[in-house]
Regions:
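Conserved polymerase palm-domain catalytic core
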Residues: 1-11, 15, 47-59, 63-188
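Conserved phosphate-binding loops in nucleotide/dinucleotide-binding enzymes
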Residues: 21-22, 26
Length: 188
């Protein structure tokens, strides 16, 4: 039977001098994760909202910047929020992610497989540590899982707020855990 292996923890420098932890999956895990990602993308790509750009097929950073430029210049944008969800990948709730995944995935085997990867732990300097939260940056499946989480936890909420409560025009562009919202009205 297939067993998920712990990710190997390495660190790479961030532009601000701090270190970003990456989780490098074993080759077997990468292969199985790629197969799962292919299946899950077919399910979730039809659900993801148009203002989500990060780590999606056929979408790029340049397209996100173009969408932001068009939104800010073509609409009356007077106020901007530029946000980064600090430590998002490292602190993502497994419990909430699994709840979100269960909305669209009925196959218990797929759900158990995803849970195995989330709980496989990390190996750093030969020591294994459990993972109770987070999804390793560097794993094949992590960007898609992050997009699923943010689709339910952020995108749907923002879309609902924008259509029901916003007084003026609102521009939204999200790339992974970074997003920009432009408002016409300060009260929004």
């Amino acid at each position: 039977a297939y067993r998920a292996k712990p990710s190997k923890r390495i660190y790479i420098p961030k532009p601000d001098g701090r270190m970003r932890p990456l989780g490098i999956a074993a080759l077997e895990d990468k292969i199985v994760q790629q197969a799962a990602r292919t299946v899950l993308e077919c399910i979730y790509e039809q659900d993801f909202l148009g203002f989500s750009y990060g780590f999606r097929p056929g979408r790029s950073r340049h397209q996100a910047l173009d969408a932001l430029f068009v939104g800010v210049t073509k609409q009356k944008v007077n106020w901007i929020i530029d946000a980064d969800i600090r430590g998002f990948f490292d602190n993502l709730s497994h419990e909430w992610l699994m709840t979100f995944l269960e909305h669209r995935i009925a196959d218990g085997r797929m759900l158990r497989l995803l849970k195995k990867w989330l709980r496989a732990g990390v190996s750093e300097d030969g020591e294994w540590s459990p993972t109770k939260v987070g999804t390793p940056q560097g794993a094949v499946i992590s960007p898609l899982l992050a997009n699923v989480f943010l689709h339910y936890a952020l995108d749907l909420w923002i879309q609902d707020w924008r259509t029901r409560q916003a007084i003026g025009e609102v521009t939204i562009v999200r790339y992974a855990d970074d997003f920009v919202i432009g408002f016409r009205e300060e009260s929004d």
